[in-house]
Regions:
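Small-residue-biased structural context
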Residues: 30-37, 41-43, 47-49, 105-113, ...
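Aromatic (phenylalanine/tyrosine) cluster motif
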Residues: 9-12
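Acidic/histidine-rich alpha-helical segments that form the ligand environment
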Residues: 40, 103-145, 159-167, 174
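Alpha-helical bundle segments that constitute or directly flank the non-heme di-iron/ferroxidase center
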Residues: 27-55, 77-88
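Short, contiguous alpha-helical
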Residues: 57-101, 144-204
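Charged/polar positions within long, soluble alpha-helices
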Residues: 46-49, 53, 87, 91, ...
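Cationic, low-complexity basic patches in intrinsically disordered or flexible, solvent-exposed regions
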Residues: 3, 7, 21
Length: 204
């Protein structure tokens, strides 16, 4: 073995062992998206059902959501966003842009309904939507088809569906932030260690 070659071989072997232990992530699969989407209703139910209103009936200031608003927003998105836009991509491609999404469209959805009713409604509509999504039996070529978002321009169906899952996670984070704010004064100096009390990320 030439001088330096042994060291190079050891470096290559070390790199290969690291890659084997920490493989590069594979492309996000539709099955991964569905796996998360089908768990969100149960997660919300476990966290929120029968909690005292002191946790759920306040917001973060003018123009922001309560926990009840967030659940209503998720229901509204099931009806108006993900599958309607997926169908439009499959039927029209980029020739017919998506309808604009009303961030406050959930107000009517929530009217007169307690949080447990909204949790039940979200569980039901999510199950219906996932059944339809599975029934589409989407193929790789279909996932690469593009539609036109009113502000973002061309977006792929695969991107829309991955965003559906990330949107769930965004609002789970938002719910934790809204709820944690109720403890802001009570935690005293421990607030320095609590990232959730410092976050002001977008949640709508």
């Amino acid at each position: 073995m030439q001088p330096g070659a042994e060291q190079g071989f050891r470096s290559f072997s070390l790199h290969r062992s690291i890659v084997q232990r920490h493989p590069l992530p594979m492309a996000h699969q539709l099955s991964d998206t569905i796996a998360l989407l089908e768990r969100t209703p149960a997660g919300l139910n476990a966290l929120l059902r029968d909690l005292p209103a002191s946790w759920t009936d306040h917001n973060e200031g003018e123009g922001t959501f309560t926990v009840r608003d967030v659940v209503g927003h998720l229901i509204y998105a099931e009806n108006e966003d993900w599958l309607p836009r997926a169908r439009r991509i499959l039927e029209h491609g980029e020739s017919k842009p998506f309808d604009a999404f009303d961030r406050w469209g959930h107000v009517e959805t929530c009217r007169g309904k307690a949080l447990p009713q909204l949790l039940d409604e979200f569980t039901r509509i999510r199950a219906v939507c996932l059944q339809e999504l599975r029934s589409l039996k989407l193929q790789p070529a279909q996932l690469q088809r593009s539609g036109r978002h009113p502000s973002l321009g061309p977006v792929k169906l695969s991107e829309l569906l991955a965003t559906w899952a990330a949107h769930d996670l965004t609002h789970l984070h938002q719910i934790s932030r809204i709820m944690a704010a109720t403890c802001r004064d009570e935690v005293g100096p421990f607030a320095a260690f609590l990232g959730v009390l410092k976050c002001s990320g977008h949640g709508g």
